[in-house]
Every structure is written in C-alpha cells, then in structure tokens.
C-alpha cells in the first residue's frame, strides 16, 4: 500500500485514490457514525422529534414511504439492542428523510423511482436496480446542471 504518499504524489494512481470516497478514513467507520447518530438522538428528545416531524410531512404521499416510516417507528420503539441495530436504524432514518424531501420537493418521476428502489420491493443494497418502465430521462434531466 502507498499510505499517505498515495494521496499526495502526482502520478495517476494517487489521483484515483484521492477521488475515491474517503469518508471512512476521515469520519470513522460507518458503525461509529451510526452510533453517533443514536448518541445525538439520545442527548435531546428534540433531535429525533425534529427529524421525525420533517419525515411526517410526506405521510400519505406514497404507500412505500408510509411503510418505511412505519418500520422506522418500530425500530426506534424497540430500545433493547438498539446499538446493535444502529446502522440499520440510521440508514432507515436517512432513507425516510430523503423520501420525505423528494416526495415534497422533487418531480414525481424522481420521487417515485426513489421510493421504488430505496423504500419498496427487493432492491437490496445494490444501486442502479431500476424498475422496468422507469423514465430515466426525467431523472437525468433533474440531475443535469443548467445555466441560470
């Protein structure tokens, strides 16, 4: 391994390393981050209340979203063993918040595909598994940078 030199020298390989996601190096493992989310929620009841209030604003907009929110409340209600489920709970919390924001602020085609691929069905943890009939052009259009 190149160690620190792999990030600072000017050959092509270090550039690839620099462009790779470094969150696990900078912020610690995913489990540490998930446990920190639980710690923040435990410090003040206002923290979780604020996030769940934001999530609840989209209730009723999509049945897959509603099911995910129900699962989230179930996970949060089962205090026993919560640290062992920290990654799952933090991930579901993030997905529900993303879903709420997309359902309220994104074009319906974008929100629908998010709910289908992240909140419902059997997508697993693999990105890029879109359902048949997805209007990919609308998603790409939404992500495109436009001159103002």
What do these predicted ranges mean?
Residues 1-148:
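Flavin-dependent oxidoreductase catalytic core characteristic
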């Amino acid at each position: 391994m190149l160690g620190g030199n792999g990030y600072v020298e000017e050959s092509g390989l270090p550039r690839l390393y620099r462009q790779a996601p470094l969150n696990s190096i900078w912020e610690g493992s995913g489990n540490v981050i998930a446990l920190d989310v639980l710690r923040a929620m435990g410090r003040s009841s206002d923290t979780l209340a604020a996030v769940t209030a934001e999530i609840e604003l989209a209730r009723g907009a999509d049945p897959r979203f509603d099911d995910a929110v129900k699962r989230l409340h179930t996970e949060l209600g089962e205090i026993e063993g919560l640290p062992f489920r920290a990654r799952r709970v933090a991930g579901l919390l993030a997905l529900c918040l993303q879903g709420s924001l997309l359902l309220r602020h994104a074009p319906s085609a974008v929100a629908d595909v998010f709910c289908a691929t992240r909140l419902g069905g059997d997508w697993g943890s693999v990105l890029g598994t879109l359902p048949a009939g997805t209007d990919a052009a609308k998603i790409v259009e939404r992500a495109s940078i436009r001159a103002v």
